[in-house]
Amino acid sequence: MYAVVRTGGKQYKVSEGDFLKVEKLEGAVGDTVELSEVLMVGGDKVAIGTPLVPSASVVGKIVEQGKDKKILVFKSKRRKDSRKLNGHRQLRTILKIEKINA
């Protein structure tokens, strides 16, 4: 069985036992999180939401809270000797999908 969930403005296809790297979610390591924005549930019987599947949810456990690798943003103006270098590290959460409720 698999499901398509929406979190952090992105869509992910998940099944039970998968590890999922998403935008930061509130909670500590070991807490359970319920993702209620389920767009589709597949398996023996397919259910497609319009836009969401009613009474469907995905339960996951927070495995890790942290930051991604640093992304360097370099901006320059040609012929002006004007340069700017910024760095950014996005906060992220790693979930282990435990159960898909359909």
From Swiss-Prot:
Assigned keywords, A-Z: Ribonucleoprotein, Ribosomal protein, RNA-binding, rRNA-binding
GO molecular function: rRNA binding; structural constituent of ribosome
Protein name per the record: Large ribosomal subunit protein bL21
Gene Ontology cellular component terms for the protein in this record: cytoplasm; ribonucleoprotein complex; ribosome
PANTHER family the record matches: 50S RIBOSOMAL PROTEIN L21, LARGE RIBOSOMAL SUBUNIT PROTEIN BL21M
Residue pairs linked by disulfide bridges in the UniProt entry: none
Record-level GO BP terms: translation
Described purpose of this protein according to its UniProt entry: This protein binds to 23S rRNA in the presence of protein L20.
Protein family membership: Belongs to the bacterial ribosomal protein bL21 family.
InterPro entries in alphabetical order: bL21-like (IPR028909), bL21-like_sf (IPR036164), Ribosomal_bL21 (IPR001787), Ribosomal_bL21_CS (IPR018258)
Subunit and interaction comment: Part of the 50S ribosomal subunit. Contacts protein L20.
Coiled coil: none
Keyword tRNA-binding: no
Record has Ribonucleoprotein as a keyword: yes
